[in-house]
Amino acid sequence: MQNMMNTSQSFQNDSVLIGDKNTLQSINKSVDNGSKNTHGITGIMNLGNTCYMNSALQALSHNYLLINYLFMNKKQIIRTLLTNARKIFKDCDNFKIESTISPIPLELRKKIQSENYHLSMLTVEDVNILLNNTITAQIIRLFECMWKNNCVVVPTSFRKVFGEVRDKFFFGYEQHDAEEAYSCIIQKMQEELAEKRTIRFKTTRHSVGEYIKYMNDVKEKVSCLPNGKEKDIVMNKFKQIKKQMPRESLTAESFREMKKYYEQGYSYITEIFSGYVHSSICCPNTSCGFTNDRFDAFTHLSLSIPVKNMYEQLNVYDCLREYFSQETLDADNLWNCEGCHEKVQAIKKTKLWTTPYVLVIQFKRFGMTRIAKDNRFINYPMDELDVSSVICSQQFEDSVQTKYKLQCVINHHGGLNNGHYFTYSKIENTGEWYEFNDTYTGKVTDNHIVNQNAYILFYIRSDLFRSQ
């Protein structure tokens, strides 16, 4: 361990260029096992109502952007997990010094709780214990086994760690939701691999760069001026420029908000699965015109299913339009405008701002009350999903990509209380679709993929998708 400490490089202060094509190209490859046989056709044993977990694992294990990142960066990932060990485990019951029933050795618990914690304090045994208690290391180990041989794996170790997260939300043998499993796995990997980095964004618009430079110059100038007339003159001029360059101003604001989000804890998991939505609320008073802009990250879109005539066919675009439709804030939901300080009837608009590498779409078949399941058929494209119709009209960066190809479908068969989850996944290096249904695996034809049981769709951006 000491030898690893001496030879490894620290990455804590590296800067990251979000959306860097060079990084993408390095992992944008098929999983290669040195064999001409198709690999990754592995079943997962159901350990007692764990089909929800198995289906999420199969979807993630056949996401080649994720798989290649995990496999090709294993050493750095392990180092990050060990570096972050105190942050990951210091609030975990098993790692508390006062615990009387913890399976973790007392000496290791003391190291984790120490404010002076460092990798050099760890023994080989410590390293193994720590890694065995992380979702990320367990999922790498599981996926390596799944891709090494076409077999059936029994995910006992992963299940044990997975059952401990979210205050043991998944503990026991109750049925849960596949979306909850997916979200939990991604969130835990983000947390475990989070690093402080300096984040940069590259604009494709010269005017945006000029605006950001001007804005920074104004901030520097204002910071040196005393409160008074001269400062007011500078700020009033800036406000005029801002009004004249609304798109540049909004883009600069988005960079600022996204920078904060990524710098709170950067990981490549976040970059793969995260996109941004832009919400705006505008005051209707012509004398005011104040607009509140907000940018929010997402790792999946949870889409309501519109109410339609029973004879009208639904498609994923109907659901996207419903999700991104404008909302009137009236009656008991009046908006308190920060500009005129009045409660007004305003319009809230929400649109996509940036698109993730992997777009995950959930159909809300169970609703808020979970009284019944909506079994209606929803059509969705396999070869090209184009989300350009729900991109914010103020977004004018050329780098925003809007077309996707389907990679995976998590299906839910049956009713609300007696359903079963299984997965259709595309094997990226052959283009063939397979069904993964707990221990069962088998080829399926394309006409099976778009089906009434579809619950969660996984799309990969077309500009990242390898041609067959």
Curated annotation (Swiss-Prot):
The lineage of its organism: Viruses, Varidnaviria, Bamfordvirae, Nucleocytoviricota, Megaviricetes. It comes from the Viruses. Its EC number is 3.4.19.12. Belongs to the peptidase C19 family. Keywords: Hydrolase, Protease, Thiol protease, Ubl conjugation pathway. This is Probable ubiquitin carboxyl-terminal hydrolase R319. Residues 42-462 form the USP domain. Pfam families: UCH. The active site is at residues 51, 420. GO terms for molecular function: cysteine-type deubiquitinase activity. InterPro entries: Papain-like_cys_pep_sf, Peptidase_C19_UCH, Ub_carboxyl-term_hydrolase, USP_CS, USP_dom. It catalyses: Thiol-dependent hydrolysis of ester, thioester, amide, peptide and isopeptide bonds formed by the C-terminal Gly of ubiquitin (a 76-residue protein attached to proteins as an intracellular targeting signal). Transmembrane segments: none annotated. One of its GO terms (biological process) is protein deubiquitination. It comes from Acanthamoeba polyphaga mimivirus. It is an enzyme of class 3 (hydrolase).
